[in-house]
């Protein structure tokens, strides 16, 4: 099972979102997502969070909260994703190799082109302060020829 982290960093009523548009082959291409990535061998979820935020944004996250766990079933892949909110950081945004970083007003997040399941867990994360777990299943039909 793959383990990942996903973080939504907040500042002045806005959330830092990543528009995935730089790689030709990218399951997230054309979608807005939070920042994060795969947990490396020997790394804790929190260590992964801090490393991925730094690599993708240039920011050093100081204050954060683990909000939930999402189990993604994507075809034959199972991904265990730990969801975070970031509240305080130092540093300046850098150019991200994954896509375009942009501060989006919190009330506009659900108007973006997100994965279907993201609408569910983002609503839950922002409406309730309690830790939660959710399972999301995606099935992609591919042409066998």
Which stretches of residues belong to each language-model region?
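Short connector loops at helix/strand junctions that flank enzyme active sites
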Residues: 2, 29, 34, 61, ...
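A short coil-to-beta-strand element that immediately follows conserved catalytic motifs
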Residues: 60-68
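Conserved Nudix-box catalytic region and its N-terminal flanking loop in Nudix hydrolases
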Residues: 15-51, 55
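Conserved N-terminal beta-strand and adjoining loop/helix that marks the start
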Residues: 1-17
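Nudix hydrolase/Nudix homology domain
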Residues: 96-145
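Active-site-adjacent beta-strand/loop module that shapes the phosphate/pyrophosphate-binding cleft
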Residues: 11-13, 72-92, 102-106, 118-125, ...
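Short secondary-structure boundary/capping segments
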Residues: 7, 23-25, 92-94
């Amino acid at each position: 099972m793959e383990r990942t982290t996903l973080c939504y960093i907040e500042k002045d009523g806005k959330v830092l979102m990543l528009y995935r548009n730089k790689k030709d082959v990218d399951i997230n291409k054309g979608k807005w997502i939070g920042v994060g990535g795969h947990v490396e061998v020997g790394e804790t979820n929190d260590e992964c969070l801090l490393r991925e935020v730094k690599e993708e944004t240039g920011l050093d996250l100081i204050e954060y909260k683990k909000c939930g766990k999402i189990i993604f079933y994507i075809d034959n892949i199972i991904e265990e994703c730990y969801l975070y909110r970031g509240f305080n950081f130092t540093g300046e945004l850098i150019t991200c190799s994954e896509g375009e970083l942009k501060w989006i007003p919190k009330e506009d997040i659900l108007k973006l082109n997100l994965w279907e399941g993201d609408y569910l867990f983002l609503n839950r994360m922002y409406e309730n302060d309690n830790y939660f777990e959710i399972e999301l299943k995606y099935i992609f039909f591919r042409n066998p020829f």
